[in-house]
Amino acid sequence: TPLYSSAASDVYKRQVNYCTKENIPIFPGAYTPLEIYNANKLGATAVKIFPATQLGPGYVKDVLAPLPNLKLLPTGGVSVDNIASFFKVGAIGVGMGSSLFDKALIANNDYDGLFQHFKKIAKEVFNAKQ
C-alpha cells in the first residue's frame, strides 16, 4: 500500500513516526518517486517498492540517480533469475515471497533441493554485491 494513499496518509505517518521514535525498523511501501522520497523523509528504515518486476531494475537506478542515499527494497516478483539485477543498481535488499520457497520442493519434502535453492539465491546476491 502506498505511503500516501488518501485514506491512510495520517495512519502511515503516525506508524513511521512511532517506529522511528521507538527505534523500530519500518519499511513502508511506495510506488512513485514522491512516495519514496516522502517515506524516506519521515524516517523509514528503508522503502519497499512494489511491484518490482513491473517497475524493474531501471526504475531503481533512475530513482537512486538523484537520491543516492535512499534505501530501497524492491518487492514483488523478485526471483533467483532477477535478484542480482536489483542489487547491481543499488537496492540494499529485496523482498521475496513465493519465489523464495519453491512449492514443488516443499511438496516433495525435498529439503536438500530447497537448501540448494537457498544457496543459489545467496550466491546470486553475494556475486551481485562484489
PLM regions with names:
Residues 20-21, 87, 104-130:
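C-terminal helical cap(s) of enzyme catalytic domains, especially alpha/beta-barrels
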Residues 20-25, 32-59, 103-110:
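Glycine/Thr-rich beta-alpha phosphate-binding loop at enzyme active sites
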Residues 9-10, 28-33, 52-54, 73-80:
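Glycine-rich beta-to-alpha transition loops that act as phosphate-gripper elements at the mouths
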Residues 1-8, 12:
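Single conserved hydrophobic/aromatic residue that forms the stacking wall/gate
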Residues 18-27, 66-73:
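Short beta-strand/loop segments at the ligand-binding rim of alpha/beta enzyme cores
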Residues 34-42, 79-94:
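Catalytic cores of alpha/beta
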